[in-house]
């Protein structure tokens, strides 16, 4: 062991520790140490390689790292391969921004191969950057062999999975409505749609009923641009609709609107007169035909047979009739399929109208809203603005549209029951993440559109014949090379697009142009990361994953995509347990964003307080599944606790080194045997701290197993602050100063060493740097080379003592109460008091104080501490009248009775009412009215008034110099009266404190001796202290010589340090010098 610097520098420690890990390849050594252990197969949810990690990503990896370190220390062979999502729109959009591209046309002009190379280079460069960022956070994962979705073997895992789906009849080519980003010109998943408010038109439109004059159905929509694709109007079967005769500006017409909405709709249309002529149920309207109000300007509308249909999603709002465009809405599409309506989608991939829309051709749909309204003319009943939640592309933030296109789908809806069954077999942290949130999401599962119309991704391995339209799904690169007779150097676009396969019909099979949904990439991670399907050994041994953890948004993302792909491919869930964590937000609960200026980067925190503080903060500030509301005050609190830990670790070092202390370690290997074998001999405070660290270990162990990392880390931080620093160190400090050979000192050394060794073991998964640093100084000759190579030590039940822990808790409550009572009595803790009394009704308080009486006396700085069960005879009671009760009982005499109570003996009144009796007050003549004025029974013949417990309340009446404060299950009374003896000790302690402060200013070592000169201006105080405390002062401050004399003169400049002090109003001058 070596002495430790007083200045705690997290950054220096972390830099040195990480260099130590690199030099000694500690991560590899730890992995090899547990290679024969039971496997713990972890699958890393892959972040996109788009640049700098943010606070949420850091939190995610810290959670993972803490859990993996815990399992390694428990002897598990942890499979901890890192992973990266390196395909998809996240990468493409970043590269497009870099190249200044605005559309797919720009990419095509630039060249697909060049664009793919740019994406690959961008993804790899950022992967390397993120590797370094994660390693700087102290993350121990296999980054050298990280799975990368761009690797050929990974691509094969996705291809194999799709081929398996085809084999099981779970792959379908279909023309359906999907979420569509018009900027990226691709389908996007439901989980990729982000919602925020947009302001759109809110329009009411008249659809003329075929064969009727001036008679129309009134519909409402917020997407006028979809009207060129209208094919039907939906009504509610059971709704009642009204035929309304309406007049405006002398023109009459007939409008059909839901009866309950007639007034609001007609008012919006500014009709001067209107009346309901008849009503019909929605069921009676089914089959009615109508014409499009745009049929004269949109050619395609002339070809559509428009009619009224029923739908269960129609609501009694707006007009009660819904415009149906099956090519532009999911509900509309489902209804259109059911009703065999035309699926019309006259919009191209860029969101522009096709030629069949006539006057709107070539216009971007959302920009055309105004022109559509103009074209409606008199068919536009009313228009307003509405602000509502609208979906946007997750990557480029463009408002999405719904668009019917030809896509490839996995039949997830047919696997719904199996997925729900499998979810129940998974252990979820928290439980409701699976049983409620995820379960509910799966219940609504639709078929999964796995195709995307982009470039940088895993190409969909489907080849279609240009002659017979037959298609073939390829499962591996080898299969493709065999079928095509061509080498496939890179399974990405555009190379794989050039590979053709001869068809049996004589035609040529060419690959479809689509790539996989990037969620499909990560969906196969749990089998791809073990080399499946090319290798099967590890898959058969390890799969499914033991554990995964990601953010709550992954219930719709990675948790779901994995489950969908796995149930289709293997018929079971790909993971055994899942921890869902929250989002990293700012202190006000807002999402961090550059526009709000509230982004806090991990590097910013690390630069200020270091990695371990960041780790402990994000782990302790909230439960993993709750959102993390970052605030700097919380960071500061954890940072203070780390400084306190450093000071506690540093505290015994000078004494241990001076005494050449070596912990008992058999064969140079420490195992805590000294404490276990001497536990009954140790002082109570040592036995207590040993019990506490083991109790904490049990809580930390149980909490970490259940992913309750907040509970585990809070328990550790609280132990450091409350148990170790504020309590145990204060109790044990005097024993560190004992001279020579001392059993009590050895007990203290062995105990604090034991506690620190156990503490760094417990903290290692959460704060790997500071624990490594402390361990490196504490470890014995043959101990493992790293704290992370230690075996995890849970609670040692043989060393726990719940009774002692409870007793000490009572004593700590006593300690707080003593300080409060002293403060009330203006008596500092440094000044002794003669007696402290505890009054309680609980025998266990008396037992605790009796057992720990020396601790109580030491902490209270009292000559004696006693416990009284029931009542202390020095405490009196003052009876205070309860006027409300007196008024009710004595009426106008209540003030007279009040005076009698105040003048009476409070102790006597309390004794009577406590015994359940009435107390009689003697009436003074003239004070009380005639008996018939009294409302309660009194005996006037004896001249008394009876009062009960309801008439009075009691406050303590303390003797002079006695002050009280409440404690758990009792009250503490402190006698602050000073005797000459107590006064002498008080001044002596004040002098000692100041000399010790001057020793620190001279930076003296613990063992250094000094010469001291104390001049006291007050003769009485000088004589009082000198008579009994001069040797005691010299001993405490390690003074070879001590001069204590009465003088108002300075001590002189012959000393190394001389200072004037005001000691409780007494002027003193103290000079000290180190003895050579």
UniProtKB/Swiss-Prot annotation:
It catalyses: tRNA(Ile) + L-isoleucine + ATP = L-isoleucyl-tRNA(Ile) + AMP + diphosphate. It comes from the Archaea. PROSITE patterns: AA_TRNA_LIGASE_I. It is found in: Cytoplasm. A motif ('KMSKS' region) lies at residues 591-595. One of its GO terms (molecular function) is tRNA binding. A motif ('HIGH' region) lies at residues 47-57. Keywords: Aminoacyl-tRNA synthetase, ATP-binding, Cytoplasm, Ligase, Metal-binding, Nucleotide-binding, Protein biosynthesis, Zinc. One of its GO terms (cellular component) is cytoplasm. SUPFAM superfamilies: Anticodon-binding domain of a subclass of class I aminoacyl-tRNA synthetases, Nucleotidylyl transferase, ValRS/IleRS/LeuRS editing domain. ATP binds at residue 594. Its cofactor is Zn(2+). GO terms for biological process: isoleucyl-tRNA aminoacylation. Monomer. Catalyzes the attachment of isoleucine to tRNA(Ile). As IleRS can inadvertently accommodate and process structurally similar amino acids such as valine, to avoid such errors it has two additional distinct tRNA(Ile)-dependent editing activities. One activity is designated as 'pretransfer' editing and involves the hydrolysis of activated Val-AMP. The other activity is designated 'posttransfer' editing and involves deacylation of mischarged Val-tRNA(Ile). Belongs to the class-I aminoacyl-tRNA synthetase family. IleS type 2 subfamily. This is Isoleucine--tRNA ligase. It comes from Methanoregula boonei (strain DSM 21154 / JCM 14090 / 6A8).
